[in-house]
Amino acid sequence: TQFVNELSNNHASDLIYYLTNNFFFPYSNCDVKYFSSGDDFFPHMIEAIQSAKKFIFLEYFIIEPDSSWNEIFNALKKKVQEGVEVRILCDGLGSPVLSTSYYQNYLKANGFKSRVFIPIVPVFSTHLNNRDHRKILIVDGQLAFTGGLNLSNEYFNRGKENRFAYWKDNAVQIQGQAVHTFLQLFLQSWNLFAKDIEDFTPYLPSSYGIYDKPGITIPYGDDFFNNKDIAEDIYLYIINNAKKYLNITSPYILVDNHLQEDLIFAAARGVKVSIIVPAIPDHLITFCIGKTFLDT
């Protein structure tokens, strides 16, 4: 309520009110750092893993067993040997190798706790289209990373020559009270198909550092099994309230009629709309569909 009152003349207050009603709360005691590329982000991620004292949680759509993952895995394995709890949650479609029973058993044999989010077997599962596209790394409940970077060489511009040229994506590091929401999101995903629901309490820090930074942080995430499209609602609100410009970067442009009409209307009322997409596609069909929209 205090945050909403302080921002009563700002569109941010509407978003805060909406998110709070969906149980995603604003935090002021936070520090946020932006990484403009995967190659900038990677060493910070390794450093954060190496700093862990209690636990490390990873939730990723794509984890590819390549040289980048080997470096991450070795850093995680060393922490396990030091007594740090490591949990890995990967998507059954996005991480086909890690999702195999062989690799899951390999992780568990090395002391990891690991689960697969909706395996693609059976193929005709009613949940097949519910995928976990999150990219979250949490260390000790005090620090979290999120953004567009999966765990694969191409995202970090590492390994052999990248067939997609330079991969441009980004990530953010969050420290402070907002990490609470990332813990909540991860543990809810972890417990989705569990027989016994765990108590979250032991993973919640008793205190956080003091971060004298301006602004507020509101992490949020869509629920996998309800009809609320929180992220879409927020994007539509931002588009429809833009006054000067809209800068959009995305690996894929797959928009429905509603979003397309809102973007066209924004441009028609004088908003400068700029959209940046990759020149070299990693999924040709998706690229062609997106190009059809951009050519309209």
Residue ranges of predicted features:
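Acidic, Ser/Thr-rich peripheral helices and adjacent loops at domain boundaries
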Residues: 288-296
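Helical hairpin unit composed of two closely spaced alpha helices linked by a short loop
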Residues: 252-274, 278-283
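N-terminal localization/anchoring segments of enzymes in phospholipid and broader phosphate metabolism
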Residues: 1-233, 237, 241, 265, ...
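A short, polar/proline- and glycine-enriched secondary-structure boundary/capping micro-motif
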Residues: 154-159, 259-260, 286
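Active-site metal-binding loops of divalent metal-dependent hydrolases
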Residues: 149, 251-252
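A short, conserved beta-strand element enriched in hydrophobic/aromatic residues
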Residues: 169, 249-250
